Amino acid sequence: MTITKAHALIALAAEAVLPLADCADPTSSSNGSNGGASAAGTSAATTSYDVSQIPTDEEIAALVPAEVKARGILRNGASADYAPAEFLADDLQTAQGYDVDINKALAKVMGLNDGTTNHAEFPTIIPALGTKFYVGISSFTITSERVAQTNMISYVEVGSAFGVAAGNPNNFDPTNPCGTTIGVQTGTAQEDYATELSAQCVADGLDKITIIPHDQQTDITPKVTGEQYDATFADSTVIGYTVTLSGGQMEQVGEVVESAPQV
């Protein structure tokens, strides 16, 4: 999760709820949101982690800024198109996922009434911290650039993986992606990594990778299954979940790479 320097007390609250990450359903449901997309355009049964029994930590609650305490709400910004971490239910309004449940649990520890999650395009979340949102829990890979802007508290380590249409009809080779077309979400670590791979291809005298960024990860899946893109590159959790819900239309190729702490 990412938080502004002024709201660093959330780091303390995070310590109290991190064990939930080990037992929460990765398709858990939570609070309302606007925008985003349902997971891979398919339905999946979801079960929210029950945070009702999580006690308030009075020491932490005493540190909550007056503005946050007055609202009684821990406002989270997330790109609600990145299942199973954060995505929308079939009503296209209700945010769900393990990051969403973590935010609700944090709110309980801080003595607040609720933790809400609203959709925002991924690159806009960090600039909105401290104004529109109090916290950003949205599958951020920790980088030096992001740490310069926010405090970042990791509670999970996630890698990256490639997803292709079932049967890999375009013969995408994850060990040699030069000359291919790859869809990524804008502003992600995968976009940066794919850019580095493409530069290496050119340096080696090979064709560059055509990298096509999208604001929403869910927009990429039909491009892959329709063979417009050779592959998509995303968090390994996202690729695995997309494959599971794709009804046999998608598969993962290659190993998980670039495993890193995430918030």
Predicted regions and their residues:
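Bacterial lipoprotein signal-peptidase II cleavage site
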Residues: L20-A37
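Short, hydrophobic alpha-helical packing/hinge segments within bilobed ligand-binding/sensory domains
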Residues: I102-N103, T124-L129, D219-K223, Y229, ...
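Periplasmic-binding protein-like
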Residues: V156-V164, T244-V263
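Alpha-to-beta junction loops
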Residues: L112-N113, G130-S139, T225-A234, V238, ...
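Sec-dependent bacterial lipoprotein signal peptides
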Residues: M1-A21
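Acidic, polar ligand-binding/catalytic clefts
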Residues: G115-N176
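Extracytoplasmic small-molecule ligand-binding "clamshell" domains
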Residues: G32, G41-G136
